[in-house]
Each structure stands twice: as C-alpha cells, then as structure tokens.
C-alpha cells in the first residue's frame, strides 16, 4: 500500500466570487457540477467549460501574478460547496511534490508552460508512465484514482494555471492533495 503524506500548500485567502472575467466561467462550471455526473465525467465537462472560457493572465493583479521565489503560491479565487477555483503561480524551477487528488480537478494554463510527469501506483513503488508539456491554452480534466503526477516549471518565465477542484477549499487547512513518498521506477521501452 502506498505511503501517503497529507499536506496543504500555501494559499492566500482571497475570496472574490464576482471578480471581473470570472462570472461567466463560474456559471458554466456550476451548470456542469449540478448535472450529477460521476467525478471523471464532471472533470471532463468542467474542462470543456474551462477550454471555452479560459481567462487570460489579466484575471489576476500584477501582485498576484508575481508569485514567490521560495514557494509555489496559490490564490483562492472562488469557493462554494460543489467546487473551488484557484490560480497557481509557478516561478521558474518550482515544482510540486508527487501527488494525487481526493476530488476531481480540471486545469488550464494561462501563461508559460507546465511540465507534468505522470505515475502509476504499483504498491511498493511508483512507476513513471509519461510526460506532458502543458502550454498556454491546454486544458485537462481528471479524477481519482490514477491521477498521480508532479508538475514542474522548467521554463525561464512565470507559469500561471487556473485549477477547478470538486471541493470547497475555503475552510482553513483544506487540501485536495495527497503526497506520495515512494521509490520511483521508470518504464523502459523494449528494443
């Protein structure tokens, strides 16, 4: 069984449900979450809404877009019982721990490039199963189980992504991430 460490990343408690540029997106997300779909289908439906109405970096203030050189910063932009919206600010070189989620998620890149390494839980170890470069405009949706990954900004500019989680993250200390501390194996192709 995987050894899992629960941890919460730094989150600014910014609640602005009527933030300019977000109202239409919130309405579309709300409509999808009310359909009663299973988590995977909800994540994919919300990803479609995000793809169609992805805001630009100007959704955030100049100060919010700066981030922090010492740690990944997230800004909680909206929360309600069915979902929350966060903006993540990735300075060059910043990366997450290897983690998965306890709720569905959809995300889109609005600035820069985020490199994602995907893993499979094989009990006593994780196996790397793929790598993806998510560029501006790229959107993805996923739900547990099987969403183990690590995200890294390997570029030389700040990356910004918008994340929609199927949980209310407004309570202090709430996180949708589970971190993994297991040996990693890479699948090698046969020649």
Write out the residue ranges for each language-model feature.
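Short acidic-glycine-tyrosine-enriched beta hairpin
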Residues: 121-148
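A short glycine-rich, His/Asp/Glu-containing loop-to-beta-strand
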Residues: 62-92, 139
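A short hydrophobic beta-strand segment most commonly corresponding to one strand
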Residues: 106-108, 156-172
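N-terminal leader/capping segments at the start of a protein or of a new domain
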Residues: 1-56
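Domain-scale activation on soluble regions of proteins
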Residues: 164, 171-179, 183-191
């Amino acid at each position: 069984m995987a050894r899992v460490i629960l941890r919460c990343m730094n989150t600014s408690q910014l609640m602005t449900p009527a933030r300019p540029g977000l109202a239409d997106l919130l309405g579309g997300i709300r409509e999808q979450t009310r359909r009663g779909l299973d988590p995977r289908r909800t994540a994919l439906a919300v990803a479609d809404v995000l793809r169609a109405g992805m805001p630009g970096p100007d959704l955030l203030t100049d100060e919010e877009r700066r981030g922090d050189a010492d740690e990944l910063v997230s800004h909680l932009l909206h929360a309600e019982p069915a979902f929350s919206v966060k903006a993540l600010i990735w300075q060059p070189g910043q990366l997450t721990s290897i983690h998965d989620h306890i709720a569905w998620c959809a995300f889109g890149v609005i600035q820069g490039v985020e490199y994602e390494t995907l893993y499979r839980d094989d009990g006593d170890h994780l196996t790397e199963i793929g790598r993806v470069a998510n560029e501006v405009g790229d959107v993805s949706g996923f739900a547990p189980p099987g969403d183990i990954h690590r995200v890294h900004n390997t570029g030389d500019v700040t990356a910004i992504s918008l994340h929609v989680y199927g949980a209310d993250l407004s309570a202090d200390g709430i996180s949708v991430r589970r971190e993994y501390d297991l040996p990693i194996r890479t699948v090698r192709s046969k020649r």
